[in-house]
Amino acid sequence: MPALILPLIEAAGHWPARGSLLGLDLGTKTIGVAVSDPDRRLATGIETVARKAFTADAQRLLALAAGRNACGFVLGLPLNMDGSEGPRVQSTRAFARNFARLTELPIGLWDERLSTAAVERELIANDVSRAKRAKIIDEHAAIYILQGALDRLATLNRAD
């Protein structure tokens, strides 16, 4: 059975109470990957996957998830500033649909507006060279996306 693809809050209801989540930042050339601790408090970068073909990319992501006993994925959804969906969102949703056929782990979609821009500003503020930024930007964006999702989930859990 294919994985569920839901907004983050709805997906959280399908994940066990504990277990790592993998955060993904889909770029056109690379996929940034981050992982949470099992208690879902802190996101840490794993790697930047150079995109090749969908099947190869998906197999790498599934191997990373299995190696960290992940129970779900958080996929950054690049909405436009006004909240509308453009071509990048359509591409992300298509990736999610295809990826869901290969796993049963629920996929949560999380608004990632300005994540790459925020990370870029932070790296520049820390005097990271342009060449180094290009190599790590997607992984850091995945950390930013996953940490934002973890923080939102923690807020919901406190409200319960």
Swiss-Prot record:
Keyword Coiled coil: no
Any one Gene Ontology cellular component term annotated for this protein: cytosol
GO MF annotations, alphabetized: nuclease activity
Organism field: Rhodopseudomonas palustris (strain HaA2)
UniProt-listed SMART domains: YqgFc
Role, per record: Could be a nuclease involved in processing of the 5'-end of pre-16S rRNA.
Keyword Zinc: no
Family to which the UniProt record says this protein belongs: Belongs to the YqgF nuclease family.
SUPFAM superfamilies xref list: Ribonuclease H-like
Keywords of the record: Cytoplasm, Hydrolase, Nuclease, Ribosome biogenesis
InterPro entries found in the cross-reference section: RNaseH-like_sf, YqgF, YqgF/RNaseH-like_dom, YqgF/RNaseH-like_dom_sf
Main location per the UniProt record: cytoplasm
A Pfam family it matches: RuvX
Enzyme Commission identifier(s): 3.1.-.-
UniProt-annotated location(s): Cytoplasm
Record-given protein name: Putative pre-16S rRNA nuclease
GO biological process, one term: rRNA 5'-end processing
HAMAP family in alphabetical order: Nuclease_YqgF
